[in-house]
């Protein structure tokens, strides 16, 4: 299982996670044959409904290209600080996603 966890930076994943994803190129055929499961966990300060559109599209394209099985996404809208995150529904959503796996 591969879990992509990242804050949202300029409507995409962090540079650190993007570096890891870019390194997949050398292992595409190996990853493709393994039929791994994947999930996306992300948070952002913004709470507009379009906040995660670009990251969702990138994740879904990556999952399709590498032949991962998407197990779900937790998109944490309005999680700009740890206290904002704790006060929201997203920690529980992440917990439930983890339990379902």
Model-found features: residue ranges?
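Glycine-rich phosphate/pyrophosphate-binding loop and the adjoining helix
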Residues: 60-101
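Helix-loop-strand module that forms the ligand-binding subsite of alpha/beta enzymes
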Residues: 1-64
């Amino acid at each position: 299982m591969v879990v992509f966890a990242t804050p949202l930076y300029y409507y995409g994943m962090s540079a650190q996670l993007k570096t890891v994803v870019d390194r997949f190129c050398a292992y595409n055929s190996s990853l493709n044959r393994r039929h791994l499961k994947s999930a996306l966990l992300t948070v952002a300060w913004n709470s507009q409904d379009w906040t995660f559109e670009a990251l969702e599209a990138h994740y879904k394209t990556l999952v399709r290209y590498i032949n991962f099985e998407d197990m779900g996404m937790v998109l944490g809208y309005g999680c700009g600080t740890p206290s904002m995150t704790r006060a929201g529904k997203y920690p529980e959503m992440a917990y439930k996603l983890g339990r379902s796996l």
